């Protein structure tokens, strides 16, 4: 897995190609359904797709907060305070959850 702060479009393209190669091995009904779901998630136009992307991003932050600070590089300190803000802004609940995760991040940094 490539950290968010190092991921470039070429990495996104590789991941997408690998996913579609795998999906093409499924029976045609499932292949079409999975492709449609993937497209819905990547377009982020539906509420479900927005929630999916927000939760995926928040989960990354929670896991990051669980890691030891010795594994963090300097740019992660700032990124962890702003990452996913744009992905939760459509929901008051997810915005509040993002704030709680940010507070955990700040508490972790202050313990250092």
Give the positions of each predicted feature.
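Alpha-helical, largely C-terminal catalytic domains
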Residues: 1-112
